[in-house]
Amino acid sequence: MQIETLTVEPLTKEAFAPFGDVIEVEGAQLRLINNGTTERYHDLARVEAAGTQTRALINIFRGQSFAAPIDIMMMERHPFGSQAFIPLNGRPFLVVVAEDAGAGPARPRAFLARGDQGVNYLRNIWHHPLLALEQKSDFLVVDRAGREDNLEEYFFSDYAYRIETTQTA
């Protein structure tokens, strides 16, 4: 099996735009509410829930920690809904995404999310399951429920991708 190394990039709205939304207050529209006592950072992600009898779900995922090197052997996507991950412990995490290549994901890209950033994967975006760093971490996850199966998995057979370091280049 051939192994190709991925370089970790810093997570920015511009770099992540083809895959979804970076959830952060920086650059967000600010609205004062509750008689000016609360700052509301408005409309941070595009939540999608398509299909039959759908609704948004709010979950907490507890991710086990990963240490480098990390081998990316598979990816998944959700054809009927977006999926958002917002860290609750303020710890950084890795985000691995790929464009669609027709028969599966294209070459993945790896991003390092700060502990004050979340991500929202748009529908049909290939991504690796949760990659918490440092220690076990909790994430608020906004997901989709509905009748249709909302999970497709792809396992790389000819080669894998490796993240040698969790630091950005």
UniProtKB/Swiss-Prot annotation:
EC number(s) per UniProt? 4.3.2.3
An annotated Gene Ontology molecular function? ureidoglycolate lyase activity
Q: What class of enzyme is it?
A: lyase
- Required co-factors: Ni(2+)
Q: What does this protein do?
A: Catalyzes the catabolism of the allantoin degradation intermediate (S)-ureidoglycolate, generating urea and glyoxylate. Involved in the utilization of allantoin as nitrogen source.
Question: What's this protein's family per the entry?
Answer: Belongs to the ureidoglycolate lyase family.
Question: Which NCBIfam families would you find in this protein's record?
Answer: PRK03606.2-4, PRK13395.1
Provide the protein name: Ureidoglycolate lyase
Q: Identify the taxonomic lineage of the organism of origin.
A: Bacteria, Pseudomonadati, Pseudomonadota, Alphaproteobacteria, Hyphomicrobiales
